[in-house]
Amino acid sequence: MKKLVLSATLLLSVATFAQKDELKTLKKIYAKETISEKDLIAYKTASDALETSATEESDKVYAKFYKTMYPTVVLASKGAKATIQDQMSLYKPEFIKEYGEVINETLEFEKKSGNKIYSDELIKEKGDFKKGLSAIAMNLNNTSKFKEASALFYSLYTFDPKEEGSSLQNAAYLATQAKDYVLAEKYYEEFYNSDYFKNGIIYYAVNKANGKEENIGSKEMRTKYIGMGLYEKPRDERVDKSKAEILRTLSVLYAQNDSDKIKLENTVQEARKLLPNDEDLLITHFNLYFNQGYELIKDDMKMVEEINKVTNNKKIYDELVTKRKEIFAKALPFFEKAFQVKPTDESAKNILKITYEILGQPEKAKANK
């Protein structure tokens, strides 16, 4: 029994030493300025081995870190020969998201463990990457490449969701500018449900140089600039103050994209409570009901023609008349709601009057003059 325990202990020790060797190899290669093809192979081999054998939390954290960083090591190995395409491969949404996650996870682990191996480097790397990504996105926006700019702003958000909520809003707005309304709907929904929208604060201050109020980005940065004498008159504003406008935008997008009608109804009703005099919302709300009703009766002329052809056949005639009434009965609630939303609309008034007459409700038809 002791031999078995000893063997297990020995195997565990060997595995532990192997993991330490792999970590040393990865750390050494990762720190190099110039990476050879041999280094690249050694890095990949050590990374794969560490991922398979890691059992301790620290080993798992760094196994994920080194695996995720592999594309950056590949790029570094190409040196001056790296093409624009090689560099842009690091700007794929999937990698940017993983890159941001692994940086945050590694920073959190090193803070918890008190052993800061990469923290200072990663904090700088994170900031530099965000600045670079933001600069590219802004340049694309300035050259009217809205779809591409939207994609990069969204990637910036997925890279650092806690700090880049405003980038998600930029992505949504630019998707609209690019006329990609389906993507805009997705981004605006995500923005509306984000922690940034619900709890975020915008930190404003007036630039002394030009007298304009500007969004400084963070409370810490604003305090610093005010202390330097560059800004004055600080003001805070909750992000969700724009709730009415975001709901308005979502209402228009849901209508544009012919999205779920219940979702549109709930959104436009909530938006109109906040913006009761908004004409676009009024029209969107009206059309939501009117169009659903009209969709049901759009083939009524054909049905009337069929009915007129069978006046000599009472059975078929009665069946078609009954069927027509059933269709108008289904459409009635939509026309009534449309009329309630916009009682001055002549189309709604006339079609509602006709519907009442077809359904044998003459009193309601007369009242609807």
Regions found by a protein language model. Give the residues of each.
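Structural register within alpha-helical repeat arrays
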Residues: K60, K67, V74, I136, ...
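Bacterial Sec-dependent N-terminal signal peptides
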Residues: M1-L26
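Structural motif corresponding to the intra-repeat A-B loop/turn of tetratricopeptide repeats
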Residues: V74, T143, A178, N257-D258, ...
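TPR alpha-solenoid repeat register
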Residues: A63, G165-S167, G200-I202, I246, ...
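Short coil turns that delineate tetratricopeptide repeat
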Residues: T55-S58, K111, P161-K162, Y196, ...
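Residue at a conserved register position within TPR or TPR-like alpha-solenoid repeats
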Residues: P71, L140, L174-A175, Y254-A255, ...
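Post-signal peptide N-terminal segment of secreted/secretory-pathway proteins
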Residues: I29-N141, K145
